């Protein structure tokens, strides 16, 4: 295991997130085949109003900021067009030991989302320290992919990475991630109601400090399902077991954050409205629910609120450095 920058336990929840404000959001034909949550092509996609998407984006950023979350907003570049740039958690993750991890993406038109200037902006504006780059993007040459915290649901506090194999989540790359960042793996097959592989683990489940949301019905192997539930209980998580319908409404695509004002769970209005009163009460016993309506992003992009947020766990520096000095440990962080 590579040496870490700190031996302190990693907190589960971040107080800071990266969001990327899109310039060319839209239905992406290169991702549609592997994402059953992504809907609408043709005329309906062509009539999508960018202003509606930007309003949804701004509403989420504003709601999080009002709740005390530090939101670092990067601007998507107009060229080349990047229809999924609003989902930065698929290409980058930031860790408490100073590690920045970059990930291989299935769709060729998503790979230009990995932009060094975004990482530099995060480090500069947040006054963060970066000590190591783990760049897995070279695995794209082998047609092997691992799409960040879309493919991975991380129990950071207990060093367990949950993942369901799919065209976007390769077991070999998963093993490399686990070795580089010192995670135990819990893998399982997950299918939607039409018996298709679920594209990303983070629509199947979410993990907070003391709870986990899981679609048990999607984990088709009974032994795998029992193992996942047993591991979650052993690590102190109260389980909210959602249905396949609720999974389709992004009820598993939620994220707990920990600003100074108190913990919150970010989710979409669609997800919130799908919860039963009992499920909602259980979640509210752990954190406040912050729900925002993002119907266009969910419908055309096939991702929910959690997909729009890349948590920032990087350690702070004593002073604000220049971008290049702060990123001195990074070697060619984009492909």
Could you tell me what each predicted segment is?
Residues 1-335:
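The feature marks the mature, well-folded catalytic cores of soluble enzymes
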